[in-house]
From Swiss-Prot:
Organism: Xenopus laevis
Region named Disordered: 417-443, 455-475
Alphabetic keyword roster: Cell projection, Cilium, Cilium biogenesis/degradation, Coiled coil, Cytoplasm, Cytoskeleton
A Pfam family of this chain: TPH
Any coiled-coil regions, as ranges: 217-283, 316-440
Name the UniProt record assigns to this protein: Cilia- and flagella-associated protein 53
Gene designation: cfap53.L
InterPro entries assigned: CFAP53/TCHP, TPH_dom
Length: 516
């Protein structure tokens, strides 16, 4: 029992020297500061504010990006609409101007036609005069044609009959052909040189453009990588902070649950201790009652034994004195003893009765005292139970509030996590769309370059084919010309209709080409 008393849990209540006096031991000062809960709450609120600020900033940036994208699209759409509207207005204006010009021209033509119709109303004399004028002009024209024909025939006859003129014309024509051929070769070389220079310039420009675009793409890629790394670091930091917050909330929740279990266990131990104390008190009272009863029975037995010893001594003493007087005395003594025994029996009975009454009174007093003490203990127990219940209820309410607050914080953290994940997914989707657009633009640019190169190659091939055709046509023309020249030189006459107009002028004036 001493070990159980020594190892039982200690409480803050200590009984005093007087009945119903209880003292409360002071609590040990907490190692935490007084405003620990306030500081902890502030720290939680600051962390939550930081997460909310980050989420709000991310949402704001996403809204800004979306607004900028929509604004750019609207600006582009409005610009295209304005350009289309301006083009349509210009087209309508040009169309109206053209209609006005055509209507004005139509009016002028109608007026001219009317005037012409009015002017055509002529008399017979005017018609005869016009007919005479027409006959005269026709006669002059026919005479001019006849004179031209005669001059041509004379010139033709001169060319056919002059051998020196024929050889000189052949030499001049040959010189012109050589000069034109040399000019064609020089022009071809110049065109080839210009084309090569243009190809070189185009290659340099294309290479510079390619390098500039590669450098720009590299800068964009580095910028995207840095931005993605920064976003990944921010997401990782937010995720780590959220994990730490969740871990701290879970630890706090487990601590609160453990504290609640500890309070329940303390309440159960207190109830068990009260039951044990009640049992010990009842046992102590029963032991005290049994001890008093045993003392009383032992005292009665000792008194009876003393009385029997005294009577036995008188009897033994009577056997030693055998005189009559003594016998008589013995008889008297026996009577006295009998009376005394009866008196003692009466007194003993009276004492027993008084003791029974006293026991009853004591038991009644004990019962009354026990009832009073039980009532007092019950009241104290009820007061302690109420106090403990209030403390437990308050602590339970505090724990429940903390659990609800932790659950709310966990819900907010989960919501923030969902927002962060949605923002991350949206950023990834935007990055994917942007990469796809850039890839599409790059592919389109590559296709344009390939088509441009193919077009340039086809153009060059067409130019080479055209040059080849021109060269072949030149050779054919030269060959035909030589054949024609030989044919003309072999014939006595060459007509003017097969000579170039520029050469015809030179041939028509012999003073320009005849030697002086």
């Amino acid at each position: 029992m001493l070990y159980s008393q020594r190892s039982r849990p200690r409480h803050r209540e200590v009984t005093g020297p007087q009945p119903h006096s209880v003292a409360v031991v002071a609590k040990f000062p907490s190692s935490r500061p007084r405003d620990f809960a306030i500081l902890e709450r502030r720290r939680h609120e600051e962390a939550r504010e930081q997460i909310l600020t980050f989420t709000k900033l991310n949402t704001t940036e996403r809204v800004k990006n979306k607004w900028a994208r929509v604004t750019d699209q609207k600006l582009l759409h409005n610009m295209v609409q304005r350009e289309v509207y301006r083009t349509m207005e210009e087209y309508k204006m040009h169309l109206n101007e053209r209609r006005e010009r055509l209507s004005t021209l139509l009016e002028r033509e109608e007026m001219a036609y009317i005037k012409e119709m009015e002017a055509m109303e002529e008399t017979t004399l005017e018609r005869q005069a016009k007919m005479r004028e027409r006959v005269k002009s026709l006669r002059e024209k026919r005479e001019k044609e006849r004179m031209d024909f005669i001059a041509e025939k004379r010139d033709q006859q001169f060319r056919e009959q002059c051998e020196e003129l024929r050889s000189l014309r052949s030499q001049i024509h040959l010189n012109e052909v050589c000069t034109e051929r040399m000019a064609q070769i020089v022009l071809k070389e110049e065109l080839n040189r210009q084309r090569k220079e243009e190809d070189t310039i185009f290659d340099q420009l294309w290479e510079q453009d390619r390098l500039a675009k590669e450098e720009q793409e590299e800068k964009k890629r580095q910028k995207r990588i840095e931005l993605n790394q920064e976003i990944a670091c921010l997401q990782k930091a937010a995720s780590e902070a959220q994990k730490m917050q969740e871990k701290r909330l879970k630890e706090e929740e487990s601590k609160l649950m453990a504290e609640e279990q500890r309070l329940i266990k303390l309440e159960e131990e207190r109830n068990l201790k009260e039951k044990q104390q009640n049992k010990l008190q009842v046992k102590s009272m029963l032991e005290d009652s049994i001890r008093l009863k045993m003392k009383r029975l032992a005292r009665e037995q000792q008194e009876e034994l003393a009385l029997d010893m005294k009577i036995l001594e008188h009897v033994m003493q009577g056997y030693q004195d055998d005189t009559e007087e003594k016998r008589q005395r013995k008889m008297e003594l026996r009577k006295e003893q009998q009376l005394y025994r009866e008196y003692l029996a009466q007194q003993l009975e009276e004492e027993k009765r008084q003791e029974r009454e006293m026991d009853k009174m004591i038991e009644a007093e004990l019962e009354k005292s026990w009832a009073k003490k039980s009532e007092q203990m019950r009241k104290e127990k009820e007061a302690r139970k109420r106090l403990m219940k209030d403390v437990m209820d308050t602590r339970r309410v505090q724990i429940q509030e903390k659990l609800e607050r932790n659950a709310k914080l966990q819900e907010e953290l989960a919501h923030d996590k969902e927002l962060l994940e949605s923002a991350t997914e949206e950023h990834k989707q935007l990055e994917t769309d942007r990469n796809a657009r850039q890839m599409k633009v790059a592919q389109q640019y590559q296709r344009d370059l390939v088509s441009q190169v193919a077009y340039q190659q086809s153009q060059r091939q067409a130019e080479r084919e055209e040059e080849q055709r021109e060269f072949e046509a030149g050779l054919t023309a030269e060959k035909a010309y030589q054949n024609k020249l030989r044919e003309i030189l072999s014939r006595p006459y060459v007509g003017h209709e097969n000579i170039h107009p520029l050469r015809r002028g030179r041939i028509s004036s012999p003073k320009d080409w005849l030697p002086q």
